[in-house]
């Protein structure tokens, strides 16, 4: 990475007008109405299960991308990196999306509280008898009450971290107090440990427990790698669009875009490495409680085509597309590459 001093920000202050600020609660209201209508008509048409999985897919995309941006902020302070100062604010804003995402999690957690099992089969009565003795060991963890308590803790921690960095960063813009940077750097050490722990258990709860019999200790790393990749793409895309609109034209340089592209390239390979390593370990062990998960997704259902497509479109194409130094320094190319990565991550 280019360990250069951060540029002096001279762009005019950008703020939302009063009219635009008023659109925020209106947007939340429209979203709530839309989710409610989808729930009602999906229930009436017998398609609630399909709606639930579609909503979970989109929610997981937004959550993992926001968490990837929060990781970017924490690691920037932890390593005392100077190259990313001008793009760090973009990541801080995306990390703040974790607060409204707590509200958007309600369509997932409320059905769990009500005892519905369209998403999570462990939430239905008698699931222990159907699963056999292996489920007995998961009984205390996969319970309705603990599921809700854990998610309250996750969002409380993430919101605190995001608000802490965003609040201190914006306050430093006003006061110029260098001590705020030192505080963020010191707190980033223990925050990284807590953040990593929440990622592990949140990935278990949100996605791995969709199939409660299956287990993999590498799945949280897989979830994390995809989230960071999506977060880097979102940061890069937003920075490029801001510059195209005439803002921060000189503050974000080609070298910084090159660094972001290198990180995207690295996490593309890291995501593929973790995905293959998880598959290899399960294939080698050949334990039925693990192998059925891959058997269904590659050979016993229509999802096999989607799984093979991930290998091509999520790994090979972005890996080869971001390999050359010249393309990583081309803003137009990075614009389309960021959009592509976000789409394939979703």
Which residues does each predicted region cover?
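N-terminal signal-anchor module of multipass membrane proteins
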Residues: 2-68
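Long, contiguous internal "core" modules enriched in hydrophobic/ aromatic residues
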Residues: 18-45, 138-313, 326-327
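Transmembrane-helix bundle segments that line or gate the permeation/cavity pathway
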Residues: 52, 59-174, 191
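Non-cytosolic membrane-interface motifs at loop->transmembrane helix junctions
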Residues: 52-58, 87-89, 212-224, 336
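Membrane-helix interface "capping/anchor" motifs
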Residues: 323-334
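Central hydrophobic cores of alpha-helical transmembrane segments
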Residues: 333-343
């Amino acid at each position: 990475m280019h360990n250069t001093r951060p540029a002096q920000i001279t762009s005019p202050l950008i703020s939302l007008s009063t009219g635009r600020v008023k659109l925020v609660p209106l947007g939340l209201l429209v979203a709530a109405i839309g989710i409610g209508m989808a729930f009602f008509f999906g229930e009436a048409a017998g398609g609630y299960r399909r709606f639930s999985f579609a909503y979970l897919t989109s929610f997981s995309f937004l959550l993992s991308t926001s968490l990837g941006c929060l990781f970017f902020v924490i690691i920037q302070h932890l390593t005392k990196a100077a190259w990313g100062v001008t793009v760090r604010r973009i990541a801080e804003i995306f990390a703040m999306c974790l607060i409204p995402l707590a509200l958007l999690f309600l369509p997932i957690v409320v059905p769990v509280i009500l005892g519905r099992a369209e998403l999570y089969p462990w939430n239905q009565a008698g699931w222990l008898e159907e699963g056999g003795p292996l489920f007995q060991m998961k009984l205390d963890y996969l319970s309705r009450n603990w599921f809700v308590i854990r998610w309250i803790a996750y969002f409380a921690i993430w919101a605190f971290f995001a608000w802490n960095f965003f609040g201190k960063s914006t306050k430093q813009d006003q006061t110029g107090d260098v001590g705020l940077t030192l505080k963020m750097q010191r707190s980033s050490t223990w925050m990284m440990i807590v953040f990593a722990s929440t990622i592990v258990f949140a990935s278990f709860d949100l996605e791995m427990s969709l199939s409660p019999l299956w287990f993999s200790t590498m799945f949280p790393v897989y979830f994390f790698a995809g989230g960071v990749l999506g977060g880097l793409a979102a940061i890069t895309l937003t920075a490029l669009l801001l510059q195209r609109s005439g803002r921060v034209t000189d503050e974000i340089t080609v070298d910084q875009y090159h660094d972001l592209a290198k990180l995207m390239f690295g996490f593309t390979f890291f995501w593929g490495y973790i995905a293959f390593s998880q598959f290899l370990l399960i294939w080698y062990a050949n334990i039925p409680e693990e192998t059925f998960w891959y058997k269904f997704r590659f050979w016993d259902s229509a999802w096999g085509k989607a799984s093979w497509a991930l290998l091509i479109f999520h790994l090979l194409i972005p890996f080869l597309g971001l390999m050359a130094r010249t393309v990583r320094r081309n803003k137009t190319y990075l614009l389309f590459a960021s959009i592509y990565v976000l789409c394939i991550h979703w």
